[in-house]
């Protein structure tokens, strides 16, 4: 159960990683500023973003994929996701839990439960 929570936390951090990378690129482009001390962090975050996107794409095509994509990648709240997908909010939360379980099972079967945080 603890590893499942870690997986969900990794998914939740997608937007944080993406914002960090975007802010670094913005600063470089518009202010001609690039923090060289943050290069390693940027590389780590890009790797984590790729891991998250790969995990979510494992579920494609399915309602679980659509929900995870909208929620974690696009940053849309579950209530709005349920509206977009013509689901009740309760069904969307159930679908979210089901998607988390499928991802956790996939990660365990592939043996890729190494530390990603």
Identify the function of each model-found stretch:
Residues 1-58, 80, 107-117:
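N-terminal interaction/assembly modules
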Residues 58-59, 86:
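Short, conserved sequence motifs enriched in acidic/basic residues, glycine, and aromatics
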Residues 74-91:
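Helix-turn-helix DNA-binding module
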Residues 59-76:
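Short amphipathic alpha helix immediately N-terminal
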